[in-house]
Design a protein with these regions (language model features):
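Generic detector of N-terminal low-structure segments
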Residues: 7, 23, 42-43, 99
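N-terminal secretory signal peptides that target proteins for export/translocation
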Residues: 1-27
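C-terminal and inter-domain tail/linker signature
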Residues: 46-328
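Enrichment for repetitive, rod-forming helical segments
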Residues: 11, 35-36, 177, 324
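Bacterial N-terminal signal peptides
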Residues: 30-42
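N-terminal leader/targeting signatures
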Residues: 1, 14-17, 36-37, 162, ...
């Protein structure tokens, strides 16, 4: 556990975009593989906030073609990821599949090699996912999934902790062409090769409705004005009185979150500028949901002279002109 982890636990750097993923990514090394280190979780146990409950299953509204894309990704996950039937990978992933997880080389062949190394295929292929997503949606050629992972709080065995992992896919020509998640690079994993793919925003071609544009403006105001520039006075206007925060190291409700942000030592109110301090690499709407993804560079744990890129996510559900829930 490095010094940056200690800093995150002390000041929860979600608000500088190094985020809660600084410790939850240690629980989830790679796609579909939530891992728990008891010693590590014990170290962060004192930072867990009480009152968090499991999320209810929610599905974003989709057009028929988008529903087809979602079903395609879930079928791939069940057969290739969960059951490790890598002989089926070519049915789902493009040969030049682009991988943004820093622990897995890019390309379909590398994906097959990686999942073969995890063990034999499961026979027969299960009818259902081992851990179905609690949030799922598709917008244009993007498919997004949020998974919930339940653990026991080492400081209180009666209390459960709910941690979330995020996966984003881009579909092209009927195949999975690109994948992003929030994994942190592990020491000893293959050398990270930066992607030369076009920025993810390039593929965001669906025009949002007027209501979705309003939702995006609300999400932007929260993430930019409140999170980046520290204007907590906007919270009561932006967040519902019944707001739920699903990040387990943050207070679960609106008032708690307001006081939490105010207490951060580096989060005094600043003059709001037109530009973001760290603009999202991708943002899109999906009915009441706003999906945002940021990219950030980190030192490679295997080679401090090199850097790698990690992705950070926030999913905001907005109804009635207020943010109702956030997963991050």
């Amino acid at each position: 556990m490095d010094d940056r982890f200690d800093t995150v636990l002390a000041a929860n750097n979600r608000y500088t975009r190094s985020s809660y993923f600084e410790w939850t990514a240690a629980l989830r090394r790679v796609i579909a593989l939530p891992l728990l280190s008891v010693a590590f979780f014990s170290a962060v146990g004192q930072s867990l906030q009480p009152g968090h409950l499991p999320s209810r299953k929610q599905v974003a509204p989709m057009a028929p073609a988008e529903e087809k894309n979602l079903a395609f990704v879930l079928d791939w996950w069940r057969k290739v990821i969960d059951a490790r039937h890598t002989e089926l990978a070519a049915n789902y992933a493009a040969e030049d599949f682009i991988q943004h997880n820093p622990n897995i080389p890019t390309g379909r062949a590398a994906l097959v090699t990686f999942f073969k190394s995890l063990g034999p295929a499961i026979e027969p292929i299960p009818d259902r996912l081992a851990n179905p997503p609690i949030l799922e949606g598709a917008r244009g050629n993007f498919v997004w999934l949020v998974f919930e992972h339940k653990f026991k709080n080492p400081k209180d065995a009666a209390q459960s902790v709910y941690e979330y992992s995020f996966d984003l896919f881009r579909i092209q020509d009927g195949k999975i062409q690109e994948h992003w998640d929030a994994a942190r690079k592990d020491p000893g994993s293959p050398a990270f090769i930066p992607s030369t793919a076009p920025p993810p925003s390039t593929w965001n071609t669906v025009k949002p409705s007027a209501a979705e544009q309003q939702n995006l403006a609300i999400a932007t105001r929260f993430e930019k004005n409140v999170v980046e520039y520290g204007h907590i006075e906007d919270i009561e206007e932006l967040l519902s009185s019944s707001f739920i925060e699903h990040n387990p190291v943050e207070p679960v409700d609106r008032e708690g979150l307001k006081h939490f942000i105010h207490s951060l030592p580096d989060h005094q109110s600043q003059d709001i500028k037109p530009e973001w301090k760290n603009a999202p690499a991708l943002e899109f709407t999906n009915g009441p949901f706003v999906v945002m993804m940021w990219e950030k560079s980190y030192k490679d744990p295997s080679d401090p002279t090199r850097e790698y890129t990690r992705d950070h996510f926030a999913i905001l559900r907005i109804e009635g002109g207020r943010i109702q829930e956030i997963w991050d």
